[in-house]
Amino acid sequence: MELLRSNLSRVQIPEPTHRIYKHECCISFDTPRSEGGLFVDMNSFLAFGKDYVSWNYEKTGNPVYLHIKQTRKSIPEDRPLKKPTLLAIGVDGGFDNNEPEYEESYSIVILPDFVSLPFPSVELPEKVRIAVDTVVNAVGAERKEQVAAWTAEKKLISEHALTLQQIKSGIVIPPSGWKCSKCDKTENLWLNLTDGMILCGRKNWDGTGGNNHAVEHYKETAYPLAVKLGTITADLEAADVYSYPEDDSVLDPLLAEHLAHFGIDFSSMQKTEMTTAERELDQNTNFDWNRIQESGKELVPVFGPGYTGLVNLGNSCYLAATMQIVFSTHSFISRYFSHQSLKMAFEMAPADPTLDLNMQLTKLGHGLLSGKYSMPATQKDATTGDPRQEGIPPRMFKNVIAASHAEFSSMRQQDALDFFLHLVGKVERASNTTPDLDPSRSFKFGIEEKILCPSGKVGYNKREDCILSLNIPLHEATNKDELEAFHKQKAGKGLEENDMRSSDEIVRPRVPLEACLANFASSEPIEDYYSSALKGMTTAIKTTGLTSFPDYLVLHMRKFVMEEGWVPKKLDVYIDVPDVIDISHMRSKGLQPGEELLPDGVPEEVMESAQPVANEEIVAQLVSMGFSQLHCQKAAINTSNAGVEEAMNWLLSHMDDPDIDAPISHQTSDIDQSSVDTLLSFGFAEDVARKALKASGGDIEKATDWVFNNPNASVSDMDVSSSNSAQTPAQSGLPDGGGKYKLFGIVSHMGTSVHCGHYVAHILKEGRWVIFNDDKVGISTDPPKDMGYVYFFQRLD
């Protein structure tokens, strides 16, 4: 006790502003449930596992720790699983994780000799008792994030329900036998609550679904509410009511009265159709979900180094799938595991290692690759009875990598591709002082755009990227005859795709990956291009190639289209991806003998005309959807007036931007030199960088887009003025080699859009494919190579 009293000055009583860690070690994934328990520093309130707490004592000199140990309680092994009613994890009504319960014990430990004192104890100094009580009763910093939730938003009461005017038409709706009033559809039918018309639902992008008669009726009449027939039962809140003006499923508190107007006795009706939310739940068992997750297959669990699962924190599968593949690359393994120990990263970290990206990447790398946390758990999988592993929660890493990012710091589902790009950018910026150690460079490559003017002269633009984003040319499908026969058969049977009983009955377009790559490299026209040779506007031809081939080639398949109502939907297509590809033909050759460069100089008036101005037609369409004029103008400008779909995508992803309501300004009195330097590092000329920053209000991301979308501004400044002066990939710091690549990683997506559903990774390890489905890791028997969203290839040489 005297030893404790002599160190009282190193004990703090936590203030409300203190971040208290007590659930997980800040440099490893040890927890109170680990064999050695967890040690909370009673000065900094950081937590450390048994093997690491001495490092903190050596670094800080803090000797007093609260030791927390959790011991599992015994529970009946035959505890029944609850059937889920929500697409959710860790919430009431969601999937039952069958989590065990634990008893918690405490003691005071004084380093360096690990002298232990019991807690609670009246003999402890009052300051220590108060400090420990505060820590024990506090909500841990690790748990202040939202509880893992994978659930639809709660429906709101429609503003149109309380004022709905129903027409006295004398229509009486029978309890069954419904048919669309304008076609022969007998399923997916909606009853308009104003006039009693029964009409079919929306048509899907591929021709399946309804014939749009219900939504067309709304456009003709402005009658706002409809209820889906077949979802009406005694539980009226479960009925699927849709508001067309609000473009969402809603609650109608007067639904019983509105149904009675058409003679419907809801108490006697039976459920025959799935609601929108239930259809989303049903995706868990449809073909795509089962195929990608390999459900129904006897997957053999695999354990050991490199086979550690990641716990789903709630809509974090996009992060898990991406990081599993990233930490299967030699560059990330070397940087954050092989050549950097946990102790080395901790010693370099600031006072709070939980906020240090290098520390948390090293922690994650060691957690995934050491094998320490990849062992069979004592508890078997509740659904299969197979051995399972608990996995590690990437909570601290997510907090650091998502800091100050409105979307990734939320608990909403995100696009795995967007996260990969965000990760690469953060790692690159963190490696500014040591670029030779930057693992993100292994994904980088140069892109060269050749612009051919009708005069015969050429210009060249160069930039760097880390993904190839590929359009999918459906007209290149190799199974057109099968597709035609399938659609004829389906039309003859009167079946919708949702009615298909077997996945084998569904025929989808099959497009070779080679066709997608060829489409990327093909020529495309540039309208309204100012030719400095012709001194006027003309149409130029642009072709794109790669100036270098990266160590790891990332291919993104553009699988999403916009449906009516600007709802993003997935393109229902298979991509035939070979195990080995050769992109040698895509290498750009640069300025060739006999080619003449376009002359320098673009008139000032042309530059002024390149200032971004919103397309009035795009703005008008967006405004008609209920968005503000200013927001719509910004969306059009920031997508270079590419179209309503592109502007809508930008608008939906930037609604929470802090400057979204700031006035549009094309003038910047002072250009920040650091922003110029950043653009220079991308390979842009200085005067182009300054023009771009001026045109985009100093925003680096917008300035980059401006350069790419304004070739008039960049050709004369970014061209290859001399074939001898052009930098080689080695001079620019980019990796390079041959064009042959081997497929080693696939991120697959299940769901109707990138912002919902589920992501899974398949990785080729030690000659076999392995599935990483959050914390489930097993040998893959049927990797979905044709269903990938993002493909990762490794250069063979």
Curated annotation (Swiss-Prot):
CDD domains in UniProt: Peptidase_C19B, UBA1_atUBP14, UBA2_atUBP14
Primary enzyme class: hydrolase
Tissue expression remark: Constitutively and ubiquitously expressed (at protein level).
GO molecular function: cysteine-type deubiquitinase activity; linear polyubiquitin binding; Met1-linked polyubiquitin deubiquitinase activity; zinc ion binding
InterPro entries xref list: Papain-like_cys_pep_sf (IPR038765), Peptidase_C19_UCH (IPR001394), Ub_carboxyl-term_hydrolase (IPR050185), UBA (IPR015940), UBA-like_sf (IPR009060), Ubiquitinyl_hydrolase (IPR016652), UBP13_Znf-UBP_var (IPR041432), USP_CS (IPR018200)
Coiled coil: none
Zinc finger (UBP-type): 156-266
Record-listed E.C. numbers: 3.4.19.12
UniProt entry tagged with the keyword Repeat: yes
Catalytic activity line of the entry: Thiol-dependent hydrolysis of ester, thioester, amide, peptide and isopeptide bonds formed by the C-terminal Gly of ubiquitin (a 76-residue protein attached to proteins as an intracellular targeting signal)
SMART domains: UBA, ZnF_UBP
Gene3D superfamilies documented for this protein: Cysteine proteinases, DNA helicase RuvA subunit, C-terminal domain, Zinc/RING finger domain, C3HC4 (zinc finger)
Disulfide bridges in this chain: none
Pfam family, one: UBA_7
Cellular-component GO terms for this entry: cytosol; nucleus
UBA domain span: 613-654, 670-710
Keyword tags: Hydrolase, Metal-binding, Protease, Repeat, Thiol protease, Ubl conjugation pathway, Zinc, Zinc-finger
Record domain USP: where: 308-796
UniProt record, GO biological process: auxin-activated signaling pathway; cellular response to gibberellin stimulus; embryo development ending in seed dormancy; leaf morphogenesis; protein deubiquitination; proteolysis; regulation of cell population proliferation; root hair elongation
Binding, Zn(2+): C180, C183, C200, H213
Top-level division of the source organism's lineage: Eukaryota
Active site feature: C317 (nucleophile), H758 (proton acceptor)
Family classification: Belongs to the peptidase C19 family.
Protein name (Swiss-Prot/TrEMBL): Ubiquitin carboxyl-terminal hydrolase 14
